[in-house]
Regions:
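N-terminal entry/capping and adjacent linker segments that precede and initiate structured domains
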Residues: 1-406
Length: 406
C-alpha cells in the first residue's frame, strides 16, 4: 500500500466497517495514525450515517447479547462486553455506535461493540433526598450533544424509604448527567415546577422501563396517564445542550390514548395503540412545532401474534416501501406500506424474546474513549521501542562476538 496515495486510502477506508478498520491499523504506521485520528473517526461516522451502510441490530435477551447484520440476518455475532457478570446487564441506549451498559446505578459503561473499546464511568453515589434511604426505579438515557460534541448519560433515580414512604403519591427523585469529555457527573437541580410536580407525585416512565428516546439533540420520555391520578399523557424532553427539562407538545387528541415514543428516519415518532387491535404511527416533521405532527401510517394487529401490546417502527427499507417493526419484544417483521402485509425477519439461532436497538458501525471511542488511553499507548510504544533497541544491541553484540571467534 506504500505506493497508493493517502487520499485514495482514506476514501477507501471510509467505506469499510469499523471492525475491519481495527484490523487494518496494523498494516502500517500511516494507517494506524489515520484510523486512530479524531478527524477520520468523525468522517467515518458521518459517512456511515449518511449512507446507512453497515447497519446492525443489537439483540438483548435473558442470556443473549448479539449483533445482526440487517442485510444478512444469518450473520450473527455474540457480544462479549466488559460488564458481563452473574447479574442481568441492561442496555439502555444506542448512539453513534456506542451502547450504554448498566449493572447498577454505580456500575455503568459505554461500549463500542465494533471496536470492543470501553469507557467505564466513574462510580457515582446516589445523593438521597432528605427522608429517603433507598432507591426505587432507575431511568437512563444516552445521547450525543452536537453542540458541545460530547456524549452524555442521564441517570434519574426515584428514591424511597423513611419519611418518603409516608407520601400518598410517588417519591422524591435525583437526576445526574455524565459528560464523557469531562469524565464526571453533574447533578441537575433546576427543574421546571410543572415537571417537578409530575416527577414528585407520579413517576412512571414508559419505553423499556424508562430508557430515553434520542432525537434532535434531546432525550424523551412519556409520563403516561394514570386513572384517578393524572388524566392525560405527557412527553418530557431533556435538552442535552442546555441540560434542562421541558414539556413537548403533541396532538391533544392523543392525550388520553395509550401512547409510546420512538425514532423513525431521524424524527421523533409517536405510536398510538388503539385497544390493542391496531397502532397509528405519528411523526414530528419539524421538531418542537406542535402543528408538524402528522399521522404516517397504520399497522393492524398481525395474525401471528396473540396480543398487540407493543409495537415500534425501527427503520425504512432502502426502497422505502417497507418498515421494520419490533413487536412485543419478541418479533422483528417487515411491514409493506402498500399491501399491509407482514414478513418475519428470521434471525439465525434466535427464537427467544429480546429487546432491540439499532447500531451503526463506528470507531467512536477508538482513540479517545478512555482519557488515559493515549498516555498508556505512548508508554507502551516507548517500552516496545526500548525492547527493540535492546534486542538490536544484543544482535550486534552477538554478531561481533561471532566475528571475533571466527
Amino acid at each position: 500500500m506504500a505506493n497508493i496515495p493517502m487520499d485514495i486510502i482514506t476514501d477507501l477506508f471510509l467505506r469499510l466497517p469499523a471492525s475491519t478498520l481495527v484490523r487494518f491499523r496494523v498494516l502500517s504506521k500511516p494507517c494506524f495514525s489515520l484510523i486512530d485520528s479524531p478527524d477520520f473517526i468523525a468522517s467515518h461516522l458521518n459517512h456511515t450515517l449518511q449512507t446507512g451502510d453497515h447497519l446492525m441490530i443489537l439483540l438483548r435477551g435473558p442470556r443473549l447479547l448479539c449483533t445482526v447484520d440487517i442485510d444478512a440476518p444469518d450473520k450473527v455475532s455474540d457480544v462479549e462486553h466488559p460488564l458481563k457478570a452473574g447479574g442481568l446487564t441492561e442496555v439502555f441506549g444506542s448512539c453513534n455506535g456506542l451502547i450504554g451498559l448498566s449493572n447498577s446505578p454505580t456500575d455503568i459503561a459505554l461500549f463500542n461493540p465494533s471496536t470492543r473499546q470501553t469507557h467505564r464511568l466513574p462510580a457515582e453515589i446516589v445523593d438521597f433526598p432528605e427522608g429517603s434511604t433507598t432507591r426505587g426505579y432507575v431511568f437512563y438515557g444516552l445521547g450525543y450533544d452536537s453542540v458541545s460534541e460530547d456524549y452524555k448519560v442521564v441517570r434519574m433515580i426515584q428514591c424511597k424509604g423513611g419519611k418518603a414512604d409516608e407520601l400518598v403519591f410517588g417519591f422524591p427523585y435525583e437526576i445526574k448527567v455524565f459528560s464523557l469529555k469531562k469524565n464526571s457527573w453533574k447533578r441537575i437541580k433546576r427543574v421546571l415546577p410543572a415537571i417537578q410536580l409530575l416527577f414528585y407525585f407520579y413517576y412512571h416512565l414508559l419505553y423499556r422501563r424508562g430508557y430515553g428516546v434520542l432525537a434532535c439533540n434531546s432525550l424523551h420520555w412519556v409520563l403516561p396517564r394514570r386513572p384517578g391520578l393524572i388524566a392525560f399523557n405527557t412527553i418530557i424532553r431533556f435538552d442535552l445542550a442546555s441540560e434542562e427539562f421541558e414539556i413537548l407538545d403533541f396532538p391533544e387528541s392523543l392525550a388520553h390514548e395509550n401512547i409510546d415514543i420512538g425514532v423513525l428516519d431521524g424524527c421523533l415518532c409517536l405510536m398510538c395503540n388503539h385497544e390493542f387491535s391496531y397502532v397509528d404511527v405519528w411523526i414530528m416533521k419539524e421538531y418542537k412545532v406542535e402543528g408538524s405532527w402528522s399521522k404516517l401510517f397504520r399497522v393492524p394487529k398481525p395474525k401471528s401474534v396473540e396480543s398487540f401490546d407493543f409495537m415500534r417502527p425501527l427503520l425504512y427499507s432502502k426502497d422505502r416501501d417497507k418498515v421494520l417493526l419490533e413487536i412485543n419484544n419478541a418479533k422483528l417483521v417487515w411491514f409493506d406500506l402498500a399491501s399491509k402485509r407482514f414478513r418475519k425477519l428470521r434471525i439465525k439461532d434466535c427464537d427467544s424474546s429480546y429487546s432491540v436497538e439499532l447500531l451503526v458501525s463506528s470507531l467512536v471511542l477508538g482513540c479517545r474513549g478512555d482519557p488515559n488511553e493515549v498516555k498508556r499507548r505512548k508508554e507502551r510504544r516507548a517500552r516496545e521501542d526500548k525492547l527493540m533497541q535492546q534486542s538490536n544491541k544484543r544482535d550486534d553484540f552477538l554478531s561481533k562476538g561471532f566475528k571475533l571467534v571466527l
